[in-house]
Amino acid sequence: MDLGYLYGLICSIYGAVEDWRKREVTDFLWISMLWVGVFIHLLYNKSLLLFFIEIFAVLFITLSVRYEKFNKLVYIGVFLFLLSFILFKSYFALSFLVFYLIGIFLYYLNFMGGGDCKFLMGLSYLKGMFFTFIIFLNAILFVIPYCIFILLINLKNGNHKRLKLKNLPLLFIALKKDIDKVKKFETIMGDDENLSLIPNINEEKEEKKTYKGKVWVTPQLPFLVFICLSYILYIVSPFPLIFKVIELVIKSHF
C-alpha cells in the first residue's frame, strides 16, 4: 500500500462525508492530489525537466481554480500535461488528460456532478488511469443497490400508480415528496404530468414556485460515497467487479 494510495484513500473518505452531507466537494481535494502526485512521481522519475513541466501544469490548474479571473490558465495546464506526455511519455500526464476528457463528457451529459469528475481527474494523476478506471467501474456497481432502495421506497409509498409507462424508470432514481420539503441539494424533475427522466444536476435549480403539491426529485447520487467504498474494496479485489457480475449474469442465462 503506497503513499499515493493512502493519500487518495484519505481524500475519498473526507470527500464521501462531504458529499453525503452537502452534495458538494471542496476543490482542495482534487487539487491536493495533483500536488501530492507530482512530488511522489519525482521519487520514481528523476527527470527534473519532466518534474518542472508537470509542476507548472499543476500550478496553472491550481490558479485557474483558485482565482476566477485566471480560469483560462487551466488550458495552459492541460497543454503542459500534453507536452509532458509527448516529450517523456508520462503515464500520469496521459492519465490526467484521459480523465479530463472523460470528466468533461460526463459533466456536460449530466451523468455526473463537477465535483465527482474533478475528483477522478485528481485521482487519475495521483494513481494512474488504470487504477482510476477500476475505482470508477466498481463505484458504478455500488449505485445498483442504491437505486433498488429508492425503488422499494417508491413501491411502498405507491408512487408508481399514477406514472405513465414511459416514466417508470423514474422509480429507480427519484422520490416523490411535497414541494415544501425539497432540500437544496435535490433536483426537481417535475410532477406527474410534466416529467423529465434526465435530471439537470449541473444547472441552476428549478424554481419551486412553478409547482404545487407533490413533485418528483432526485436526491443526486452521492457518488463520492461509492468511490470511497470502491476504494476500500480495491484492497480485497483489485479488479473491476462489475465485469464479473456481467459475466455471471450472462452465464446464468446461456
UniProtKB/Swiss-Prot annotation:
Gene3D superfamilies: 6.10.250.3240. Pfam families: Peptidase_A24. Keywords: Cell membrane, Membrane, Transmembrane, Transmembrane helix. GO terms for molecular function: aspartic-type endopeptidase activity. Signal peptide: none annotated. The chain crosses the membrane at residues 33-53, 70-90, 92-112, 133-153, 223-243. PANTHER family: PREFLAGELLIN PEPTIDASE. This is Uncharacterized protein MJ1282.1. It comes from Methanocaldococcus jannaschii (strain ATCC 43067 / DSM 2661 / JAL-1 / JCM 10045 / NBRC 100440) (Methanococcus jannaschii).
